[in-house]
Amino acid sequence: MAVSEYKNASFEVVAPGMMTTVQDGGRVGFQQYGMPVAGPMDGESYAIGQALVGNTTPVGALECTVLSPTLKVKGTCIVAFTGADMRPTINNVEVPRYIPFVCHNGDVISGSFSQCGVRMYISFAGGIDVPEINGSVATHTKANIGGFEGRPLVASDEVRLKDCTRDIIVCDYTRESNHLFNTVLFNRGGRECHEPLRVVLGSQAKCFTETGIHNFS
C-alpha cells in the first residue's frame, strides 16, 4: 500500500450551515478550575470519523448541527462523514457516510438538512490546524475559546489542515465501485431514528391541553 503525503491543504467556508464548530475529544482535566470540557456531542460518531481517516489521536474535526456547511477544498485531503445523515456530497455527487474519500483542489463539500440525527462530523486526515488551549482545540462558544477564533464558522473563513502522511485506502467519489461500500456495515447511518422515547408526565402536564399531549405522543 503506497504512502501518500497531504500538505498545505485548507478549505474555504462558502456557507457555514446552521452551526459548525471545530471539536476534538474535549478539554479534559480542568473542570476544577472552571474550564469547560466542550468536545463532541456525539463522541462515538466523532471517534469513528477519526479512525476512518487514520488519526490515531483525537484531533480537530467539524461538528455540523442540523444543516451541512459548504466547503471549497484547497489542496488535497482525506475526508470522512459520520453521524447524522445530512446527505453529504462532493461536487454535487452524493457520497455514503463512514467511508474515507480523497478530495482535490477545487472540490466542493456540501450536504443538506439532516434526514436523521442532529450532528454530523466531517473528519480530515491530520486534523484541523487551529491553536490548542489546555491541550485541546474544542470550541466552547459561550467562553469564546478553542476552535476557529472561539466561534462557529462563518462564510469566507479559511481553515488550514495539518500536514500528514497516510497509507489507508481511500475512495474516489466519482467511481462506480463506491456503491460496493454502500451497505449497512460501511454506511451504518448512525443510530436508528425511530426508537420510542418513553415519557412520564409530571406536574407540568396540567399546563398542556389534552390535544397537545395526544399530539406529542
Question: What is the meaning of each model-derived region?
Answer:
Residues 1-217:
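Conserved "landmark" site that anchors the functional core of diverse proteins
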